[in-house]
From Swiss-Prot:
Species whose genome carries this gene: Bacillus thuringiensis subsp. konkukian (strain 97-27)
Keyword Cell cycle attached: no
Localization terms from the record: Cytoplasm
Recorded catalytic activity of this chain's protein: tRNA(Arg) + L-arginine + ATP = L-arginyl-tRNA(Arg) + AMP + diphosphate
Protein name: Arginine--tRNA ligase 2
A GO CC annotation given for this chain: cytoplasm
Length: 556
């Protein structure tokens, strides 16, 4: 695809060719070509220090080497208009604008596919995120994890990875036991029978509602049923209700999972016993003080970990090891877990487990999501004013909307704390980054509607070479960066780079709009070229916002 990355590739090839032509070094002696984009654009679009790198090998002054490189460089092959030497021997390259203007039809014709790369080469990646206990509402930490996780999945897919989204349902622990007992108590109370809530029960209104629903639908059937049968019923009914609620909230947040994996299935399908057998066979576990231990210190953990306690019960780590073995047996090349900040200390033992099972520790990556602090009217907001409890994903969606939440949560690196300004998130001003990006899209759509009225949408030849002004060239360069931004952000697992890019593209568009009369009835040939440029901006901005899970409105 026609992009700035291709230009960089061509420049690097021609630099290497120039080194050989000038006989400054042999092929084996040529160092890696480093190309940078100068902040000051008067120093060119790209710059290299190759002359300085070659000084020792060529036994010449860098400035002289630079002159020989320039003399042997094929500008036409690399789409370069001019080359300048600066300072002690920096070589600055200025792109040929015709290469940039070719981007316009390339982007327009690619449509939704613009920005796609084959960086991932089809590598199978599983991203497990959110995975909140199904015993209550999703809080803001979960919401941020959902936004970052889903954006990362969209980004990886755009960059050519084969991505699977997975939610791990913690349905085998004590929380689910307490949920079942809470449902039972509320059911009995709805029937008018005396039943105390468990000490660690769930006292929310939704559990009271479940109890009433059960009483209306089943009468006293489960009050009289066998204790084991009724317990299983309360457990399944409560779990099903809570999961449905989670799924509804996540889908409203534009997050859909490919797999909902039950922890209980690990027990039912013998996966835990199988994982323990593998560890035993590999001599990774030992018995001590009546417990079974994992030799995690072998792999850099700060201490060995108990897998089976002396009462025969498993620690949290044991089903987690079985779960990760199951993931790897499903054929994933890479596992990415998105965890809350409270799980930071858990990473070394899981990395150790991956190695103990016979896999490279880099097979597992863990991205940590830090907490969110809400602000309203300039003050910290600790509790919901409506419920008096922690603010939930659902409640914040109702307050500020999905677009603002998705953008704000994905706007910073996940491992940094996030201050979420609710007033800013709903403001219709340039200070609001999501409004700023969306308004740029709406502005482009408005220009395109004007273009249609001028008859610019009729097709026919377009003279792209007319797109030459300083602001137009800035816009073209920013458009050309998108595939490289996608590839780099995906490789480095930095989804916030996409919100950064959307903001930068919006700023470049607004700058162009404020400096130029975009469409001019007196110059329809230039207007036609700019109309196509605006279509390219619309496509690129839509594609960037789509990765973040944010809508691109046509009017605002």
């Amino acid at each position: 695809m026609n992009s700035l990355e291709q230009v960089k590739g061509l420049i690097k090839e021609e630099i290497q060719a120039a080194v050989l032509k000038a006989e400054l070094a042999t092929e084996e002696q040529i160092p890696n070509v480093v190309l940078e984009s100068p902040k000051d654009k008067t120093n060119g679009d790209f710059s290299t220090n190759m002359a300085m790198q070659l000084a020792r090998v060529a036994k010449k002054a860098p400035r002289m080497i630079a002159e020989e490189l320039v003399a042997n460089f094929d500008k036409a092959k690399a789409s370069i208009e001019k080359i300048e030497i600066a300072g002690p021997g920096f070589i600055n390259f200025y792109m040929d604008n015709s290469y940039l203007t070719d981007l316009i039809p390339t982007i327009v014709n690619a449509g939704e596919a613009y920005g796609e790369t084959n960086t991932g080469k089809g590598e199978k990646v599983q991203v497990e995120f959110v995975s909140a206990n199904p015993t209550g509402d999703l809080h803001l930490g979960h919401a941020r994890g959902a936004a970052v996780g889903d954006t990362l999945c969209n980004l990886l897919a755009k960059a050519g990875y084969d991505v699977s989204r997975e939610y791990y349902i913690n349905d085998a622990g004590n929380q689910i036991h307490n949920l079942a007992l809470s449902v039972e108590a509320r059911y009995m109370q709805a029937l008018g029978l005396e039943k105390e809530m468990p000490e660690d029960g769930y006292h929310g209104a939704d559990i009271i509602g479940i109890g009433k629903s059960l009483a209306e639908e089943f009468g006293d059937r489960y009050a009289k049923a066998d204790e084991k049968e009724s317990y299983e019923f309360y457990r399944e009914y409560g779990l099903k209700y809570e999961l449905a609620k989670l799924q509804k909230d996540l889908e409203s947040f534009r997050v859909k999972f490919d797999v909902w994996f039950s922890e209980t299935s690990l027990y039912k399908n013998g996966k835990i016993d199988q994982a323990l057998a593998v560890l035993k066979e590999r001599d990774e576990i030992f018995e001590e003080d009546g417990a079974t231990w994992f030799r995690s210190m072998t792999y850099g953990d700060d201490k060995n970990r108990v897998l089976i306690k002396n009462d025969g019960s498993y620690t949290y780590l044991t089903p987690d090891i079985a779960y990760h073995r199951d993931k790897l047996e499903r054929g994933f090349d890479k596992l990415i877990n998105i965890w809350g900040a409270d799980h930071h200390g858990y990473i070394p033992r899981m990395k150790a487990a991956i190695q103990a099972l016979g896999y490279d520790k880099e097979t597992l990556e863990v991205e940590i999501i830090q907490m969110v602090q809400l602000y309203q009217n300039g003050e910290k907001m600790k509790m919901s004013k409506r419920t008096g409890k922690a603010v939930t994903l659902r409640e914040l969606m109702e307050e500020v909307g999905v677009d603002a939440m998705r953008y704000f949560f994905a706007m910073r690196s996940g491992d940094s704390h996030l201050d979420f300004d609710m007033d800013l998130a709903v403001s219709k001003s340039n200070e609001n980054p999501v409004y700023y990006a969306q308004y740029a899209h709406a502005r482009v759509c408005s220009i395109l509607r004007q273009g249609e009225e001028l008859g610019l949408a009729t097709g026919g030849d377009v003279n792209y070479k007319l797109v030459t002004s300083e602001k137009e060239v800035e816009l073209l360069k920013k458009l050309g960066e998108f595939p490289a931004v996608v590839a780099d952000a995906a490789q480095k697992r930095l989804p916030h780079r996409i919100t950064n890019y959307a903001f930068e593209l919006a700023a470049t568009l607004h700058s162009f709009y404020n400096a130029e009369k975009v469409l001019n009835q007196d110059n329809l040939e230039l207007s036609k070229a700019r109309y196509e440029l605006m279509k390219a901006v619309r496509t690129t901005l839509q594609n960037a916002l789509a990765i973040v899970g944010v809508s691109a409105p046509e009017k605002m």
